[in-house]
Design a protein with these regions (language model features):
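Signature of multi-pass transmembrane helix bundles
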Residues: 1-37, 42, 51-55, 59, ...
Length: 184
């Protein structure tokens, strides 16, 4: 059995593991790991470590509500962070600055998130920014990262003179790929 695994499955697994898209997904979701751990710890504490009397005390004292808010806030950003991280990682693998790509990916993620209207007002439900929107975040992160690097590597960008500070120049170089991704 080990021979079969080593000779047949390991080369396939190594090939899949070295794919740029898979690396970007791994790194992007790993970027959200602190939020996942913090949210999980707050959830464990809010439930009183599965001790009913401790859970009741936390609820009665009003502490559980704050813990749940922290947990929900942490888990509620996983999709957004993954979208940024996946685009960032994908772009970096092509030798391009990943931060603008990640920011554009955040914007496209918000563009595809449905808005709601009602008596309470207009807004964007946060449920899609959490794990419920993770699949969309993965797809958008991969597409944004690849398209962004393609624009930059094919010099489809606004070039500034050398006298312009590098941070400003990088911002201008992100305008064309960013606009194409956000509008497209």
């Amino acid at each position: 059995m080990n021979k079969f695994l080593n000779e047949k499955l390991m080369p396939v697994a190594a090939k899949i593991g070295s794919n740029k898209g898979m690396i970007a997904i791994r790194d992007g979701i790993t970027l959200a790991m602190p939020l996942i751990i913090i949210g999980s710890l707050l959830m464990i504490i809010a439930t009183g470590f599965a001790i009913p009397s401790l859970e009741a005390w936390l609820n009665d004292a009003g502490i559980a509500a704050y813990l749940w808010k922290g947990s929900d806030s942490s888990f509620g950003l996983i999709g957004l962070v993954a979208s940024f991280g996946i685009a960032y990682s994908m772009t970096k693998q092509y030798g391009v600055d990943g931060v603008p790509s990640g920011i554009v990916s955040l914007s496209t993620f918000i563009v595809v998130t449905p808005f709601v209207t009602g008596e309470a007002g207009n807004g964007m439900p946060t449920t899609y920014m959490a794990a419920q929107g993770l699949f969309v975040a993965i797809i958008l992160g991969l597409i944004n990262g690849w398209v962004y690097q393609w624009f930059i590597n094919h010099n489809i960008q606004i070039k500034m003179p050398e006298s312009v500070p590098p941070a400003v120049s990088k911002s201008f170089s992100a305008i064309l790929p960013g606009a194409a991704l956000i509008v497209g």
